[in-house]
């Protein structure tokens, strides 16, 4: 079946077919090779892209900016302190203004409804840089990284996400694995697993793609024979440390440490993290947490020994954000 990604939004990957996702991954690999070889051709000359950031960012902002510059596009960075968004002007009105000025809009913020409103009213392609529900550009980078670190066909790769799984990472890793026919395990305390209705949507997708989906609180079941172990922070941006007590008690058994990695039974298992990671006390937040919870001084969701080991491929994952974001923009705008 033919497909066309021209002028397409990237909101969650729910509406992207497996073939379209694989095309974006292949394009990202081609663009990455071209950048390394010094043969990249700018295909977005004259394009202008607005980057709306309601949440702070390092990797997403840098990736969008470098990807755009590499391809000859211009960007404007917009944050809540430098615009009228949400103060004097609604997102709907903002969308209708920016859509007349820009060729595409990236949004990183809180509600999925907001990025969908931008897509509905702007009249230009909108790219989701992260919401509370989905993180599609991260998913493309994650799968590209797993492909690069595996000799297996895509549908034979086994990966587990472990920890607080009711967030954008848990949802998105379940969704993209279902779309691509992969062996996906989502593991965490029962109260921190993806919502049942979303799991049902992914299970319906898996019937078409042959994906194997496991959502469980059983760590040994989830990590057995895994090729890749993913995790994410246990606390969201802006949450007070005082609110961590119950969460930490729930999640401590799901911490990624040397023992958990050994429980996979795979000597070649790799560790992945969307970053930033709390793996030591070298940050202000890390020190505050260690002061309140001394048993976490050597790492929270992942321990220092795992993070600083050859198992960790999170920095290649971070680089691949840029290559996959570039692929999304080229496919939609070139």
Swiss-Prot record:
Q: What is its main location?
A: cytoplasm
Keywords linked to the UniProt accession? Amino-acid biosynthesis, Arginine biosynthesis, Cytoplasm, Transferase
In terms of SUPFAM superfamilies, this protein maps to:
Aspartate/ornithine carbamoyltransferase (SSF53671)
Q: Which reaction does it catalyse?
A: carbamoyl phosphate + L-ornithine = L-citrulline + phosphate + H(+)
MF (Gene Ontology): amino acid binding; ornithine carbamoyltransferase activity
Q: Which EC number(s) does UniProt give? A: 2.1.3.3
Name a GO CC annotation attached to this entry: cytoplasm
User: Which family does this protein fall into?
Assistant: Belongs to the aspartate/ornithine carbamoyltransferase superfamily. OTCase family.
Q: What is this protein's record name?
A: Ornithine carbamoyltransferase
Q: Which organism is it from?
A: Mannheimia succiniciproducens (strain KCTC 0769BP / MBEL55E)
Q: Which gene encodes it?
A: argF
């Amino acid at each position: 079946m033919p497909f066309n990604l021209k002028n397409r939004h990237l909101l969650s990957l729910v509406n992207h077919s497996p073939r379209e996702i694989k095309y974006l991954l292949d394009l990202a690999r081609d663009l990455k090779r071209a950048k390394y070889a010094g043969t990249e051709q700018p295909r977005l000359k004259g394009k202008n892209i607005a980057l709306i950031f309601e949440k702070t960012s390092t990797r997403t902002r840098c990736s969008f900016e470098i990807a755009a510059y590499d391809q000859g596009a211009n960007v404007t960075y917009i944050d809540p302190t430098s615009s009228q968004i949400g103060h004097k002007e609604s997102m709907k009105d903002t969308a209708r203004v920016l859509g007349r000025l820009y060729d595409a809009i990236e949004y990183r913020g809180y509600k999925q409804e907001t990025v969908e409103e931008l897509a509905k009213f702007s009249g230009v392609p909108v790219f989701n840089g992260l919401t509370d529900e989905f993180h599609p550009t991260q998913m493309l980078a994650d799968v590209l990284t797993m492909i690069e670190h595996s000799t297996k066909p895509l549908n034979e790769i086994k990966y587990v996400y472990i920890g607080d799984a009711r967030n954008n990472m848990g949802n998105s890793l379940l969704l993209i694995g279902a779309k691509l026919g992969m062996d996906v395990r989502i593991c965490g305390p029962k109260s921190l697993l993806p919502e049942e209705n979303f799991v049902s949507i992914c299970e319906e997708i898996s019937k078409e793609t042959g994906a194997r989906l496991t959502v469980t609180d059983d760590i040994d079941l989830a990590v057995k024979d895994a090729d890749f172990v993913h995790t994410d922070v246990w606390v969201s941006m802006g949450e007070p440390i005082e609110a961590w007590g119950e969460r930490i008690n729930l999640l401590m058994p799901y911490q990624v440490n040397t023992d958990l990695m050994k429980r996979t039974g795979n000597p070649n298992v790799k560790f992945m993290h969307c970053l930033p990671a709390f793996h030591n006390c070298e940050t202000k937040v890390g020190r505050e947490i260690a002061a309140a919870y001394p048993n976490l001084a050597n790492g929270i969701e992942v321990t220092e020994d795992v993070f600083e080991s050859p198992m960790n491929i999170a920095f290649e994952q971070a680089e691949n954000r840029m290559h996959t974001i570039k692929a999304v923009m080229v496919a939609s705008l070139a």
